[in-house]
Regions:
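Conserved donor-binding/catalytic core segment of Leloir-type glycosyltransferases
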Residues: 111-129, 134-138, 147-149
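Membrane-proximal helix-turn-helix segments that form the acceptor-binding/catalytic region
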Residues: 9-14, 38, 51-70, 77-80
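Nucleotide-sugar donor-binding and catalytic loop/hinge architecture
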Residues: 17-19, 104-118, 283
Length: 287
């Protein structure tokens, strides 16, 4: 709590220096409930984009109860927060659609020596990321190339075994502007589960970035989970099904569902999300 008081003083000092008047406080984590007693504000927003099961439920309950508006990134999150607030609004994740929908410069090939199918994933390779399906597929299909683009965080237990496979590429991180080059180099894009995230109806920013490219997507699901976007995403429940659906995705006719995928992403573009936020806050009298 002492750190929260210190952070509260820091924020208050910055707000005073910039002559903030009637500020709208935007919070994104239940931990920030401890700042409320140390800040002056005229409106409070709680923007929830994940399940915070590792934090005390009372923190999130208090934050949602105090908030004038609660934004929830999925229907399940909205249902969970509804008992704590009568002003819960659904606000799904968004995407930089112009960046990811623009075809890559074909003169640049991030994998110039690679032939055959390329299947890729982009993001931080966290310890909680379940890469078992990738390991199974890479061992079974040695002529396919699998790319894990992104920083390796604190280390994933399967990385040592993946590094030993000649058909697994670990290029590390890159600037966001270069990520589309890698995605467009892939024939199929992949999404995996995280052991610390169990909210199964959340459409991630990564998924929206994938969809903006129009490329086929194969995603792992929890055992009882239903794919939220079944018309544009191949959803697998096991390592074997993951490999089978990767084969189906590679065999997908050109442009079979590319436009539907881009349409899903276009509907989640950040300008449209911002318009939704402005309309909701205006209706609530916060703007």
């Amino acid at each position: 709590l002492r750190n929260q008081r210190k952070l509260g003083r820091f924020i208050a000092d910055k707000a005073a220096r910039h002559r903030f008047q009637s500020p709208l406080l935007w919070t994104t984590s239940p931990e920030q409930v401890h700042l409320l007693d140390h800040l002056e504000y005229d409106g409070l927003v709680y923007d929830c984009d994940r399940d915070w099961e590792e934090l005390p439920p009372l923190w999130e309950g208090a934050l949602a109860n105090n908030a004038d508006i609660v934004f929830a990134a999925s229907p399940l999150l909205a249902d969970r927060l509804a008992p704590c607030s009568s002003n819960v609004a659904l606000l799904p994740n968004g995407v930089n659609f112009p960046l990811f929908s623009r075809p890559s410069d074909l003169s640049y090939d991030p994998l110039p020596q690679t032939t055959g199918p390329v299947l890729g994933w982009a993001g931080t390779i966290r310890p909680e990321l379940d890469l078992e399906p990738l390991l199974y597929a890479a061992r079974t299909m040695p002529r396919w190339t699998f790319v894990l683009l992104g920083p390796q965080g604190e280390g994933n237990s399967l990385l040592p075994r993946l590094r030993q496979l000649p058909n697994v590429v670990l290029p590390g991180g890159c600037p966001m502007a270069q990520v589309p080059d890698w995605l467009y180099r892939c024939d199929v894009l992949l999404d995996f589960l995280r052991d610390d995230r169990t909210c199964d109806d959340l459409v991630s920013c990564r998924m929206l970035e994938y969809l903006a490219t129009g490329r086929p997507v194969v995603s792992m699901l929890w055992p009882d989970q239903i794919e939220p976007l079944p018309d544009v995403v191949y959803g697998a429940h096991s390592d074997q099904e993951f490999l089978t659906l990767c084969r189906h995705a590679l065999d997908e006719p050109p442009n079979f569902a590319a436009q539907r995928r881009r349409s899903h992403a276009a509907a989640a573009s950040w300008p449209l999300r911002c318009t939704q936020v402005v309309n909701i806050l205006t209706t609530a009298g916060l703007l």
